[in-house]
Structures are given as C-alpha cells and as structure tokens.
Amino acid sequence: MVRWLFLLVAMLLSGCANLGCWPNCAAHTRNSSSLVEFLYPHGEAPPVQNSIPQLKIPLRVGLAFLPSSESSATGGLDAAHQEVLLERIRQRFSSRPFVAEIVMIPDYYLRGRGGYEGLQGVQRLYGVDIMALVSYDQVVHTDENNWSLGYLTIVGAYVLKGSRHDVSTLVDLAVVDPVTHSLLLRAGGTSTSHGNTTLISENREIRGAAAQGYDAATNEMIEHFDTALTKFEADVRSGKAPVQVVHKNDTVRSGSGGGGALNWPLVLMLLAAVGIRRLERMA
C-alpha cells in the first residue's frame, strides 16, 4: 500500500510539473559554425573581386571544419566525428585528375585565425593551394507533451514522461582561394528528423539523432558538390569559369580573360628548329 501511494504521489508531482510549464514545455539547442563570420569576423562587407584566381593544377587542397561558434552537450560535433566526415569527403574527391592531394586539417588550427589573412597562414603552414571549408548549423528542438500525465509509464521505481525531438541539420562545403579572397565553389546538404523518447534516455537518443543528422546532411552535400564540381570543370574547359588554370609543368588555361597563353614546349621546339637552320646556313 505504501509503495503504491509513493508511486501515485510521484505521478501527481510529475503531472503538476508538466502542467506548471504548460504551454511552454519546449526548448532548443544550436550547434553551428559560420563561413561568413569566419571570413569576415568584424562584420565587414565582402569586397568587390578585382583579381582572377589562379589554380595551379594538380592542386593540394586543405580540407577543414570551421570552428564551432555555438555548442551544446547534446548535439555537438566532436573531433572524432569531424574526422570521419572529412575522410568521407576526401575519399570521394581525391581521385579527381586535377587533385594531387587533399590534406585534412584539424579545426583547432583555424581557431583565432579568422579572416582571409588567418586562412593564408594555415595555407602556408600546410603548403596547400586552396582551402575547402566545411561549416554546419544544427538545431535540436525538444518538446514535452503538454498532457504527458496521461502517458506516464511505471517500470519498477521509474516514472517515465514522454518527449519529442526534431533535429534540423545543414552542412555546407565552400572552396576558397585565400590569396585573391575568392569563393570558387560551394554546395550544401540538409537533413531533418523527428523522434519520440523518454526523459530518462532523452540526452542519449538526441545525441544519436544529432549524429545521424550530420551524417545524412554530409552525404547529401557530397552529392550536390559532385554535381557542382562537374559543372565547374565544364565551365573551365569552355572558358566560362572566372579562374585561370595553370598546369604546373605545362600551359595556362584561362576561364575569363587571360587571353593568349603560351604553349612553352611548342615555343622551345620552334626555337630549336630556328637554331638548327641558322647553323646549316653558316655551314
């Protein structure tokens, strides 16, 4: 009898707690990193682009997550998970013929290095030609049922209350040239999920849903970036891309402007032919 009285009191107290927060029994947490805030930390407007980026292929590409500006215990993207996602991106694009190597860079190398000037320091440190920066934004909404007293379940000594969570995730990949302060290419992916849990396992299940959100959004971003990269390659070949491509051991191809690039092997052959002809005349 005493045991059942104890459980009844616990249920009533739990119900009163729920009714006490009605109708505002909801909360949200946010985890994010911002490309705009990183590149322009003082809120300045992006300048007008006056110079054409020069891409020296095959490229060494630096790949990194931008440091988080907001974080929480239930949905943060930890270093181990970042490495898994970066490796997934690296494997997808490292086989491209114009890529020599994709170098994964831990996000702590970018902390305190906001702006293009700081990015150039990382570029020199790792000896890369361009930087591929991954940013993200994830919001987790949790909401206890306003009438959760009717959904109480007694298991042993526990009184369980129902809770619902919604997880919205965006992952974005932007390729920038730190030297000319140019955005070369970008693509993003999103993910949205919903779930129900109990307050006892709420944090664990929300962390799992948050991790799945990063995975799903990254997978979609990779597909979108692959499409955008294929189009970018076609624009370079047709001269529509606002870049100048320099083959490190060969010629120059210009996307917009740049004009008459020299084919140096052909020039050397012509000079050699002229020299031989002069020697023949002297003989």
Predicted regions and their residues:
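A generic local structural motif
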Residues: 48-50, 117-119, 276
